[in-house]
Amino acid sequence: MAEIGIDQSKLPGVKEVCRDFAVLEDHTLAHNLQEQEIEHHLATNIQRNRLVQHDLQVAKQLQEEEDLKARAQIQKRQKDLERQDSEIAQEIQVKLVFEAEQRRRQEEKDEDIARLLQQKELQEEKKRKKHYPESQEHKVYEDSYYSENGGTKLRGTKQTVYDKPRREQELSDAEIARKLQEEELLANQADQMAAQVAQDEEIARLLMAEEKKAFKKGKEKEKSSFERKRNDQDWKHDASESPRSRSKEGPETQRHKGDKSSRSQPLLDDFEHARYYTSQPSPLRQFSKPEHSPKGSRRKQ
């Protein structure tokens, strides 16, 4: 077998071989470091995405729980208002029935008084009729005069003259009592109507205030939910853009590997960039649980 001859004059020097070996070693080391950095960055992105998904699920669950609690509180307040309105209506109904019963009893009492007065008046009139003929027996001249000139008519005229002012007074008193009673009833009805109107206005004002609070709270919840969704979308967009930028920077760093100093500086920059991404906390980790809506107890005043 023929030996292959080696031209010693064409062999490179020891320094050149060492320099080429150092360049190759640096290139291999830089490639390994870049691969490790890319793998670490991808693993960090995967972990961050999982954490974001978990935070979104937790936030959605908490929001649903808050919505259920708010709806339950609104329904409870509505039921309380309905119950109070029914109680107030029942009390007003009982009061009206009681007042109607009082008016009926007063009317019956007035009728009894009028009947007693009429009976008393009839009895007094009968007594006067019985007493008047006895007094005439002692006056023969007057009796003969009355019998000859229509004394019965004159006696009836005198009795009418005596009874007329008394009847007029009784009728006037009865009319005054009736008017006073009517005025009292009208005043009571006016007071009841004014109280009912004031109560209805207060109930309407409270209901309007409750509706305004519920509407304002719903708007705030919608606004906060929209802000969270927008922040989540912006964060996802930034997270999706970072691997692309890193993949574009890889060939450029490989293309500029002239010497050891020029290769080590981009690696340090990329390492600091990766540390910055891993040190940034997730936006949704700072998610604060919304406060519970205040319990509606203002209606119970």
Swiss-Prot record:
Keyword Cytoplasm: no
Region (Disordered): 123-175, 214-301
Coiled-coil zones: 57-131
PTM description: Phosphorylated on tyrosine residues.
GO cellular-component term (any): cytoplasm
Keywords: Coiled coil, Phosphoprotein
Annotated signal peptide: none
Segments of skewed composition (Basic and acidic residues): 123-142, 161-175, 214-262
Claim: Phosphoprotein is one of the keywords in the record: yes
Molecular functions (GO terms): ubiquitin protein ligase binding
InterPro entries listed in its UniProt record: CCDC50, CCDC50_N
Protein task: Involved in EGFR signaling.
UniProt-recorded name of the protein: Coiled-coil domain-containing protein 50
UniProt gene name: CCDC50
